[in-house]
Amino acid sequence: MAAAAQLSLTQLSSGNPVYEKYYRQVDTGNTGRVLASDAAAFLKKSGLPDLILGKIWDLADTDGKGILNKQEFFVALRLVACAQNGLEVSLSSLNLAVPPPRFHDTSSPLLISGTSAAELPWAVKPEDKAKYDAIFDSLSPVNGFLSGDKVKPVLLNSKLPVDILGRVWELSDIDHDGMLDRDEFAVAMFLVYCALEKEPVPMSLPPALVPPSKRKTWVVSPAEKAKYDEIFLKTDKDMDGFVSGLEVREIFLKTGLPSTLLAHIWSLCDTKDCGKLSKDQFALAFHLISQKLIKGIDPPHVLTPEMIPPSDRASLQKNIIGSSPVADFSAIKELDTLNNEIVDLQREKNNVEQDLKEKEDTIKQRTSEVQDLQDEVQRENTNLQKLQAQKQQVQELLDELDEQKAQLEEQLKEVRKKCAEEAQLISSLKAELTSQESQISTYEEELAKAREELSRLQQETAELEESVESGKAQLEPLQQHLQDSQQEISSMQMKLMEMKDLENHNSQLNWCSSPHSILVNGATDYCSLSTSSSETANLNEHVEGQSNLESEPIHQESPARSSPELLPSGVTDENEVTTAVTEKVCSELDNNRHSKEEDPFNVDSSSLTGPVADTNLDFFQSDPFVGSDPFKDDPFGKIDPFGGDPFKGSDPFASDCFFRQSTDPFATSSTDPFSAANNSSITSVETLKHNDPFAPGGTVVAASDSATDPFASVFGNESFGGGFADFSTLSKVNNEDPFRSATSSSVSNVVITKNVFEETSVKSEDEPPALPPKIGTPTRPCPLPPGKRSINKLDSPDPFKLNDPFQPFPGNDSPKEKDPEIFCDPFTSATTTTNKEADPSNFANFSAYPSEEDMIEWAKRESEREEEQRLARLNQQEQEDLELAIALSKSEISEA
């Protein structure tokens, strides 16, 4: 009872108010205790046998007081519920979840015990049955049955818990076919209404609720009944129609079943609790015994409806209704005596069996111990053999490990030696890494500025792309006209040959008549020169400069960068180039001076720069293609374009502040490593052509017929003495900027090649000019050594932007200031920027000259770049031929 005392009333009742209701029925005076007579009368309504009820009473009244308090009465109710659900009647079953107990009550058929007669009236009244049938018909049954889907909404409308509705469905579906007929539906609705009236739903269907059509016959077959009747007649010696316990004791014990099971069968069959069995009850008892012996089926705790003898079905309901409220648990004295004897025999039997079991367990234990010891000895022997084999293997492995140890020690020495070398290498690499990190920080700053410049250029590129798109739109109507003009071009070929001869003749005559019509600084209008036939050849040679003008802003900070013609190869005589261009312009102007047709390619002068102030040059009045043949004469057939000296003109660096220094940075040098024996030792002009160190890429420079030194303003007249690069006799440059860009707002502007080193009056007027030869892009200078290369310089798309020989002082954001080591000049002292005298020891320091591999790499890049430029020039030549053809076609149209 200690376990029961620990349980509270809520735990015992599982929160069900039915337990409290039952207690109020017994303890009507609310005294807090229940007498034995009241408890016996109430517990008899459960329908359990007296033996089970007596056991329940003993478990509930552990103190033997003869009364029960509220908690003890709840324990008794809980044990009754366990017995009704087939569980063991013990205190350990109190913790199991069971439905509330069921007791007989005339007011509710749900609380009637499982024992019921076949003749019992159906609990569903006729008027209720009619109402339930109407609901059944409204649900449209199929073949007299309703499926669960149709019954489910009706049950859910009751608002009952789902578990209660599930139990109602299981109880009403008697044949378990998943559907309900009329009688089963009536049972379901009856249970729902009872549940709505707060009556508990039973765990099993009471016999009174079983429809008459579903009730079964008696379990004892007629053949068995006849056989058991013969045994009954032999046993009933007094011939009173009943047999007592003493009369059937020997027959029951001969079956070999336990006495407790026989007593349970006796209590089930003695439905009237009179201590005797009738003929039908005796047949039922033997039927239960035979079921246990043959099929092993245990007798139920409560008789099912089909087990109740037919003779007892009619009188059972009357006995239940009219039963006395007071009952005695030991009413049958003979049964008690028999039970006591059975208990004594069972106790003695249990003691003997216990002793025998203990001895058998001892024997088994000893045998098991011996067997375990034998197994252990066998295992140890096996383990010993394994260990010996392992010992041999380990010894062999140990010998191998000793050899490996010696080898590893030698390898360790070598590895340590290598580690020392690697550590030394790592230290040197760390030092180099530190220097590289500092350079990287510098490069990152330069990269940020370069990105800003890139964004600006990208914006300008977008604007230029829009202009190109608009130009393409204007070009589309001309393409159709070009197809028509190509046929005319073939007919013009012969005419062009005649015009070339006439052009050469006119150019010589016009040169004499217009000696002052030369180009100054290349600042002339594109429209005034576009009609010249010599311009077509120049356009092809300066396609790179034209592309640079289109991709960069019109006004540049450095004059050298704004003009793509400032870096031609030194092999061209600038005076001859200038005079040739001027001659072509003059000849075309004279031939077309009186033409009255309008030039279709003429651009409004308001969008261009002003022409050269010469009254003889009329660039805007006539069509250059009318009246003369620009291809009549060959401008390259008579004059050698390589006959002039590109350095014979004026000094273009005289206006720079760097070249106006009063001191000579090379004057302090005692000896000039580049000077000859004396000034008079210059052998010939041809020798100087081959020895010119300033010729780009080592190409041959045309000999100069002038004695002027364009570098005299920078290095002085006495720095080199006589011999190599003596430019002391060169004249001073004019104050005009020779690198001024000649740009125009027109997209098709082209800058004509001009000699930036030439003064305006150097060339003789009598000498006829010649057109300049095709000038390639100047060879780029040799790259710096690998350790001193500039990333910006190598990655820059403009090869002249960072290595411009004509830019004396870079700006504040120049890479030279950010990394002076990369951009150092081997010919300049470290203190040049402070205008101090140069250190002679640092002059011409070639210690940092690139290696042969760098020279090969540089030559490879130069070769690739020149190939790209050659292809670009070919494309430009094709474009110019197209434009020339269009111009010729337009001129033919205008003449017509």
UniProtKB/Swiss-Prot annotation:
Bilayer topology annotation: Peripheral membrane protein
Post-translational modification: Phosphorylation on Tyr-849 is involved in the internalization of EGFR. Not required for membrane translocation after EGF treatment or for targeting to coated pits, but essential for a subsequent step in EGFR endocytosis. Phosphorylated on serine upon DNA damage, probably by ATM or ATR. Ubiquitinated.
Region annotated Disordered, chain positions: 542-606, 760-848
UniProt cross-references to CDD domains, sorted A to Z: EH
Record note on what altering residue 154 to E does: Loss of interaction with STON2 NPF motifs
Positions of the UniProt region annotated as 15 X 3 AA repeats of D-P-F: 599-827
Comp. bias regions, Basic and acidic residues: 585-599
Domain EH: 15-104, 128-216, 224-314
Free-text domain note: The EH domain interacts with Asn-Pro-Phe (NPF) motifs of target proteins. The UIM (ubiquitin-interacting motif) repeats specifically bind 'Lys-33'-linked ubiquitin.
Protein name: Epidermal growth factor receptor substrate 15
